[in-house]
């Protein structure tokens, strides 16, 4: 069984934070999907904030899960054409 190390958790925080900072919505503001894009970003940011909360409480597993949900929302938005490609490096 793999162990969730502090290093792994920090790496996931960095990847998700970078994706949130570099995110670019590619649908115009007058496109009907713009509100959907904003919802995806907001949801991802909320999961990222949850991850920080869990980390501060010492709950690494929940922090890791919340980070995966956050990144999942960003990746889903990219997949349906709301965002530019997200860098993983």
Regions found by a protein language model. Give the residues of each.
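Long, charged/polar, soluble alpha-helical segments
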Residues: 1-89
């Amino acid at each position: 069984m793999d162990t969730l190390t502090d290093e792994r958790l920090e790496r996931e925080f960095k990847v998700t934070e970078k994706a949130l900072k570099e995110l670019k919505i590619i649908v115009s503001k007058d496109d009907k999907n713009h509100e959907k894009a904003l919802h995806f970003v907001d949801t991802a940011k909320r999961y990222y904030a949850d991850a920080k909360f869990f980390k501060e409480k010492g709950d690494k597993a929940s922090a890791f899960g919340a980070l995966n949900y956050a990144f999942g929302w960003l990746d889903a938005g990219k997949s349906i054409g709301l965002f530019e490609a997200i860098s993983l490096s």
